[in-house]
């Protein structure tokens, strides 16, 4: 405080560097990959990165909703694949007329998955990471039944199946437009509604939230429903992008999505899971994946390098921040 009674905040390089670590890391990765391959920043490759980011960010927001209420959902990968498999099955069987009706039907059916997750966790009080992991095995069995345990594709899907994932509206990929819509919905819900404030309060201190009248159990249930909704959309985005469905396509992205959501808590609102941080982290993950691919790195090298980079990033933030990384309840 100065002589005039005005509070003066001291600049802390360590604090500010930690706060913007994700953005700095993103630029470092971009420069690194560009130096190895100047084609990394061509228009087409940037569009590929944005398309990959759109899927990752949508799935990361799915993880973020549950992390916000202090829980951990290990079922979002299976839920993503489940939604894509249901959509592919409905379109191939032609039980329902039109893509839109099938899309809506899938989202409605996936709410049954969310209902089971919320009941197991919020009412039977089974730790969320155990309940969702166990439930994901049920979804895996259904996925293998629908796909036959192999790549699933049908000529009956038509071009509409890949319109979202491979099409463009002008110069902008449809996937990016889809991400903007999903982000806007999440932002309005979390930042402009009472439910959003309750979700953030429930994760901060459930006991205090209950004492001030917030229905924590109900709020957590809503978080699981939102997580399943976003995981379902992410799965549909991914299958539309690739043009087919594989049994493990969602599960292969799950840990990256959870890491993105957790790393997002180190940007913008430090110590709190938030949308801007999640988007930046998802973009960084997409840049890493695309950059290693353009360098011609083998798959196992990509996994090793991604693991090392994520470990270094998380360890650095955990060490430099006094509070460490935001936590979740595992019991």
Question: Where on the chain are the PLM-derived regions?
Answer:
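Transmembrane helix-bundle core of multi-pass membrane transporters
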Residues: 124, 128-192, 219-222, 241-250, ...
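Hydrophobic core segments of alpha-helical transmembrane domains in multi-pass membrane transport
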Residues: 22-34, 63, 107-110, 136-140, ...
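Alpha-helical transmembrane segments within multi-pass membrane transporters and channels
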Residues: 95-136, 184, 280-281
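Helix-loop-helix "hairpin" substructures at the membrane interface of multi-pass membrane proteins
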Residues: 98-106, 112-117, 168-245
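Cytosolic-side transmembrane-helix boundaries in multi-pass membrane proteins
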Residues: 1-31, 204, 210-218, 290-331
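Single transmembrane alpha-helix segments in multi-pass membrane proteins
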Residues: 28, 32-94, 120-125, 263-275, ...
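Inter-helical junctions in multi-pass inner-membrane proteins, predominant
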Residues: 38-48, 143-144, 190, 196, ...
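Transmembrane alpha-helical segments in multi-pass inner-membrane proteins
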Residues: 231, 241-304
């Amino acid at each position: 405080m100065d002589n005039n009674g005005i509070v003066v905040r001291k600049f802390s390089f360590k604090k500010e560097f930690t706060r913007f670590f994700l953005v700095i890391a993103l630029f470092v990765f971009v420069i690194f990959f560009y130096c190895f391959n100047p084609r990394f920043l061509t228009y087409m490759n940037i569009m590929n990165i944005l398309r990959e980011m759109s899927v990752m960010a949508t799935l990361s927001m799915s993880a973020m909703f549950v992390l916000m209420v202090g829980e951990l959902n290990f079922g979002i990968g299976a839920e993503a694949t489940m939604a894509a498999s249901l959509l592919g099955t409905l379109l191939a069987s032609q039980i329902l007329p039109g893509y839109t009706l099938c899309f809506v039907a899938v989202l409605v059916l996936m709410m049954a998955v969310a209902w089971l997750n919320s009941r197991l966790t919020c009412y039977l009080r089974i730790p969320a990471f155990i309940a969702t992991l166990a439930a994901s095995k049920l979804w895996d069995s259904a996925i293998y039944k629908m796909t036959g345990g192999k790549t699933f594709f049908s000529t009956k899907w038509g071009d509409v199946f890949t319109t979202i994932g491979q099409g463009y509206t002008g110069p902008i990929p449809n996937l990016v437009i889809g991400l903007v819509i999903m982000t806007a919905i999440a932002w309005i819900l979390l930042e402009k509604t009472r439910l959003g404030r309750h979700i953030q309060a429930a994760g901060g201190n459930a006991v205090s939230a209950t004492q001030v009248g917030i229905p924590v159990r109900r709020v957590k249930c809503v978080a699981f429903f939102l997580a399943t909704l976003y995981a379902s959309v992410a799965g549909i985005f991914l299958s539309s992008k690739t043009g087919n469905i594989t049994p493990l396509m969602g599960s292969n992205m799950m840990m990256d999505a959870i890491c993105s959501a957790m790393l997002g808590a180190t940007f913008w609102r430090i110590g709190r899971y938030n949308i801007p941080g999640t988007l930046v982290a998802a973009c960084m993950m997409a840049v890493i994946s695309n950059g290693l691919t353009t360098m011609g790195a083998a798959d196992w090298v990509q996994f090793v390098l991604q693991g090392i980079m994520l470990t270094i990033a998380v360890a650095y933030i955990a060490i430099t921040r006094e509070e460490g990384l935001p936590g979740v309840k595992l019991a």
